[in-house]
Amino acid sequence: MTTQPRKILVTCALPYANGAIHLGHMLEHIQADIWVRFQRMRGNKIHFVCADDAHGTPIMLNADKLGITPEELIAKAKADHIRDFAGFNISFDNYHSTHSEENKQLTAEIYNKLKANGFIKSKVISQLFDPEKNMFLPDRFVKGTCPKCKAEDQYGDNCEVCASTYSPMDLINPRSAVSGTTPIVKESEHFFFDLPAFEGMLKEWTRSGSLQSEIANKMQEWFESGLQQWDISRDAPYFGFEIPGAKDKFFYVWLDAPIGYMASFKNLCNREGIDFNEFWAEGSDAELYHFIGKDIVYFHSLFWPAMLEGSGYRKPTNVFAHGYVTVDGAKMSKSRGTFIQASTYLNHIDPECLRYYYAAKLNDRIEDLDFNLDDFVQRVNTDIVNKLVNLASRNAGFIAKRFESKLADKLEDESLFAEFTAQAEQIAAYYESREYNKAIREIMALTDKANKYIDEKAPWVIAKEEGKEAELQAVCSMGIELFRVLMSYLKPVLPKLAERAEAFLQAELRWDNIHQPLLGHTLAPFKALFSRLEKKQIDAVVEETKALFAAANKAAEKTEAKPTALSAVEPIAETITIDDFAKLDMRVAKVLKCEAVPESNKLLRFELDLGDHTRQVFSGIKAAYNKPEELEGRFVIMVANLAPRKMKFGVSEGMILSAGTGGSDLFLLSADNGVTAGMQVK
């Protein structure tokens, strides 16, 4: 019985058209590309699309700063992004832009359907307005003093120091981050998407069993906190699409951005005669998968499926989220030269090296991946050069010189060949489930067996003995056959190396012919397949990255007033009485669990043991601790009698104490050995 090919549409999250592609982006695009290439090898009908996310206030302001139009800015960004993705052999069928006619039409259509179905509400809201720039200010473009802890220079939506969330109008001494002027309050009518109306559907979708467990668990927390109506409009001036029938109102970038998936596919359909509705219509039997980072799970697991449901389109089959990239155990850093742009990497290192390294560490869970530079060099050279490519080179010479490049007519060890090909379905299952680390581990175990076989047979010894020509040909042919099987398994990960291997083998590497040996087959002359990775190449990438950002900082200093340096020590606050201090109940707490809040750039969620009970506390120290799980088991100091605060992501039942100026410059306070959970700090 022949199985019908699956119909699959795959997307990656849309890179923002206001910056360069870096190695953090590449994790997702390599992960998706490996999966797509595997599906193609399996004979499935698959389309792979992406686009630039090209709207929003930051793009409008950056273009103005550069003295160009937003259209010019996003055109250059798109060209740069396409170049970088091509450099890493990302095999998109289409790469488009959200600033397109297809996206404009689809966004208007979906909005009108949502409105007709009663899912769009309107209400007048008060916002901060920059009178100098004549524009309403998004939360992130307002700064001031936190109304809760009085920390200065905080954003308009939440405090990095105490993790409080608030309205921009609650800020003390607010100022526009665009012009520096003091904003005024103005009213404006805004449009809202009625997300709570879809809670039942979203809960059912969550329980379907297809979502990653981490996403399903996080969605349950959001349900418990209560879904809120979503503001989908922005006031002029704004770079984006105008809302039909609403003068000077524009769609918020996060409304039209995911519709960009549909628009990019629509563009491909129009060009190649593909049936758009076959993949997007309600009830479609096609599969739809979104590969995304953990920071945008909120939009893709709540707003996006609800928008599709409300406008009569199908929902995603699944959303595959991944973690962040760290370098040498720390957050990517511009000053240390580890915030590596894709173009900088490509100037010095083969992209296949990174594809392999990421694949060797990627799994199906939402975990951060550490790009360890020393381990990178060692793993690439050990696995690809010393083991895999060496298997071909150490046998190809004998076949070429002694047998006119012709392989033997039969297998020297049929049972060993069968052992290798028997792993095809298990390795396929690992690729299918995105457990690439397990696939690589299995493939490398086979590679070790292949090299052990050659070591034991020692063709270099056989070659010196008369009358053993047939044995020499059989052994070396067996080595080449095993290399062919291994390269077939690695083709989704190393497409360019696979191309060179196919040229040498003069045979296509396909999943459906893995079991068919190249008996009596003639090889092409062997050429070097892969070069060793040298430490000096890594050093060159790091140094170029440092120089790149040093030059950018120097240019910024010429165009912007240098900010006043922070004093070495913050001034002492106003005097309080002993009675004031006595009101604080500070306790030692043990961290039972600590995790990042995916939809927040600042917050970590702590589960704390206070001796006789546990509490949940949110703390805005995410930038300082990019491996929150390492805080588990540690003792911290907290204010235990602070009134609970209901936040967007749950209730925070206290405040964890830390020292520093904010951002990555924060350090948790701890106690000496011997303390126990619940002890009072005196």
Swiss-Prot record:
The keyword DNA-binding does not apply. GO terms for molecular function: ATP binding; metal ion binding; methionine-tRNA ligase activity; tRNA binding. Keywords: Aminoacyl-tRNA synthetase, ATP-binding, Cytoplasm, Ligase, Metal-binding, Nucleotide-binding, Protein biosynthesis, RNA-binding, tRNA-binding, Zinc. A motif ('HIGH' region) lies at residues 15-25. It is found in: Cytoplasm. Zn(2+) binds at residues 146, 149, 159, 162. Its EC number is 6.1.1.10. This is Methionine--tRNA ligase. Is required not only for elongation of protein synthesis but also for the initiation of all mRNA translation through initiator tRNA(fMet) aminoacylation. It catalyses: tRNA(Met) + L-methionine + ATP = L-methionyl-tRNA(Met) + AMP + diphosphate. It is an enzyme of class 6 (ligase). Disulfide bonds: none annotated. Belongs to the class-I aminoacyl-tRNA synthetase family. MetG type 1 subfamily. Its cofactor is Zn(2+). Pfam families: Anticodon_3 (PF19303), tRNA-synt_1g (PF09334), tRNA_bind (PF01588). ATP binds at residue 334. Homodimer. A motif ('KMSKS' region) lies at residues 331-335.
